[in-house]
Amino acid sequence: MVVLKVCLVLLFLVGGTTSANLRLSKLGLLMKSDHQHSNDDESSKPCCDQCACTKSNPPQCRCSDMRLNSCHSACKSCICALSYPAQCFCVDITDFCYEPCKPSEDDKEN
């Protein structure tokens, strides 16, 4: 039992001194700051299907799309639930909405 406690303490000490930009919040969420993507596939392109903006000038917009395992490539502050697969959303506030990820019904008909 003592060995287990010592191992856990060492794990926290080593984990706390690394320079990774990850934080565990009180809500069981993993916060990634300035995360980097190793691939530039379709899912990492900045886009948003569920964007809401305030009526202020300039507007303050936030995307509420949920993505698996990471946020889009332009996201500066990504929060991921500690689940498998991780469900992530970007908490950045911008003054615009990104292009939609999915084509609208009108686009499909043309």
Swiss-Prot record:
GO MF terms, alphabetically ordered: serine-type endopeptidase inhibitor activity
Residues in the signal sequence: 1-19
Sites marked Reactive bond for trypsin = 55-56
* GO cellular component annotations of the record: extracellular region
Q: What disulfide bonds does the UniProt entry report for this chain?
A: 47-101, 48-63, 51-97, 53-61, 71-78, 75-90, 80-88
Top-level taxonomic group: Eukaryota
Site, as annotated: Reactive bond for chymotrypsin: 82-83
Q: Which residues form the propeptide?
A: 20-39
What keyword terms does UniProt attach to this protein? Disulfide bond, Protease inhibitor, Serine protease inhibitor, Signal
**SUPFAM superfamilies listed in its UniProt record:** Bowman-Birk inhibitor, BBI (SSF57247)
Classification via SMART domains: BowB
Entry function = Inhibitor of trypsin and of chymotrypsin.
**PANTHER family this protein is in?**
BOWMAN-BIRK TYPE BRAN TRYPSIN INHIBITOR, BOWMAN-BIRK TYPE PROTEINASE INHIBITOR C-II
The family note in this entry says: Belongs to the Bowman-Birk serine protease inhibitor family.
State the name under which the record lists this protein.
Answer: Bowman-Birk type proteinase inhibitor
